[in-house]
Amino acid sequence: MLREITSYAELPLEETRTSETLSAFLSERGFRVKRGVAGMETAFRAEFSFGKGRPVVAFLCEMDALPGLGHACGHNIVGVASACAAAALAEFGKGVFRAGKVIALGTPDEETGFGKARMVEKG
């Protein structure tokens, strides 16, 4: 998955294939995925629930690349590592947790600094 996403090198708010790849990976592992959150087409929220209550653990899946430099900042690695960590925790938690959830947030537009801020503002 990392090689695939690295080959895309999509710019801020254009991370269509990257967002689809990460959210499909999570969906295939039992996460409920909502795409287009916070008014951004490529943002997503993936949630795996063990039941009502806590703990709640969240992972941030960064996705965008730099114009002319590709993934020089490593958001491809952050995105894949976060999605894999979320999936691993969900799998581990099936036999351990009776409550709580794992959330993976696809956070676009990291390079301009507005993606996460928009997601916070929109709840």
Regions found by a protein language model. Give the residues of each.
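Acidic/His- and Gly-rich active-site-bordering loop/insert found
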Residues: 1-103
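Fold-level recognition of mixed alpha/beta catalytic cores in primary-metabolism enzymes, strongest
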Residues: 98, 103-123
